[in-house]
Amino acid sequence: MSDVAAVAARMEQLLREHPRTFYALVRELGDAEYRVILQAWGSLREARRLGRDEHGLYQLRRT
């Protein structure tokens, strides 16, 4: 598994727990390089995995 895929999987796990801001996700993933975080975020967006709740926080879309 690539670093990007691993970080994307961690993002998905965090968003399963509860909706978060992008900033909160970045703080939770502090051990990952910011560039890898952005690439992982982009991969989730391209896959249309991200949605927002009524407060504007990011969450996983229901599939």
Regions found by a protein language model. Give the residues of each.
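Positively charged, polyanion-binding regions of nucleic-acid-associated proteins
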Residues: S2-H18, Q39-A40
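Glycine-centered, phosphate/nucleic-acid-interacting loop/turn motifs that mediate DNA/RNA or nucleotide
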Residues: R48
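Short, cationic-aromatic polyanion-contact patches
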Residues: M1-V7, R52-T63
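A local structural micro-motif
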Residues: Y23, Y34, R52-D53
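Short amphipathic alpha-helical interaction segments
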Residues: A32-S43
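Short acidic, hydrophobic short linear motifs in intrinsically disordered regions
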Residues: E17-L29
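Short loop/turn and capping residues at structural boundaries
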Residues: V26, A40, H55-G56
